[in-house]
């Protein structure tokens, strides 16, 4: 099962038209494993050196593309799909992603990056609808990812409307974070996979735990919280730790 996930927190002003609170975007996912035969210390040094050089190169570009790296925290083998970690590039449009890739390729040809300790064989894209968050973007974060399917007769707009209402209630109760809907696209698994993924993020492990407590103590069972489940079913989540690489 491919983990089609991303965490890119955005802040939006609340309004009465909840579906307009969602910002569309695109993302590219690259799944990686540490090369065999490398010690942990050697791989870490190579990774840090290459990532720093990559970030410096990417920060020099005048575009709206950013990248994060995610590491497994509460997961199992199926949830990881064999990957040690994965990268996500996020952008407002696929054109922006394509232009970024072309520019970075040309820059790497002129100034090669340090050797990588990773093998990255699988990649995919997804369309996202990013919902309102409780605060600003953070450089590190926790994120839960749920694979979901639509129920028969589901209304996606009504589902997102209920989620937006619930999110505002949850934030008002003291929860911190953001969320988004992720729709698999190019390179995604064929067959009977998820219709979409739902991701919910928190600024750090403490706020992640606090938001979980707030959900069960205060937010669970409200009209908006229950209304979400009229349109979807979701399997158990995986939890990942993320760090921002650039932008």
Model-derived features: positions:
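Sec-dependent N-terminal signal peptides
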Residues: 2-12
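Short, solvent-exposed helix-to-loop capping segments enriched in aromatics
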Residues: 112-113
């Amino acid at each position: 099962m491919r983990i089609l996930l991303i965490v890119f927190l955005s802040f939006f002003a609340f309004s009465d038209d909840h579906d307009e609170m969602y910002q569309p975007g695109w993302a590219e996912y690259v799944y990686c494993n540490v090369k065999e035969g490398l010690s942990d210390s050697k791989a870490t040094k190579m990774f840090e050196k290459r990532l720093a050089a990559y970030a410096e190169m990417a920060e020099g570009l005048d575009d709206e593309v950013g990248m994060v790296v995610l590491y497994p925290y509460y997961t199992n083998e199926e949830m990881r799909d064999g990957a040690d970690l994965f990268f996500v590039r996020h952008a407002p449009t696929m054109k922006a992603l394509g232009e970024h890739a072309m520019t970075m390729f040309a820059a790497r040809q002129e100034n090669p990056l340090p050797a990588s300790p990773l093998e990255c064989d699988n990649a995919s894209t997804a369309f996202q609808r990013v919902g309102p968050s409780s605060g600003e973007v953070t450089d590190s974060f926790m994120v839960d990812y749920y694979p979901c399917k639509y129920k028969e007769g589901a209304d996606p707009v009504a589902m997102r409307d209920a989620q937006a209402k619930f999110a505002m209630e949850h934030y008002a109760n003291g929860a911190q974070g953001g969320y988004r809907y992720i729709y698999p696209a190019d390179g995604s698994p064929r067959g009977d996979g998820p219709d979409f993924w739902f991701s919910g993020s928190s600024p750090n492990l403490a706020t992640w735990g606090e938001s979980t407590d707030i959900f069960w103590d205060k937010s669970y069972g409200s009209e908006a919280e229950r209304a979400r489940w009229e349109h979807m079913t979701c399997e158990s989540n995986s939890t990942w730790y993320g760090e921002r690489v650039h932008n």
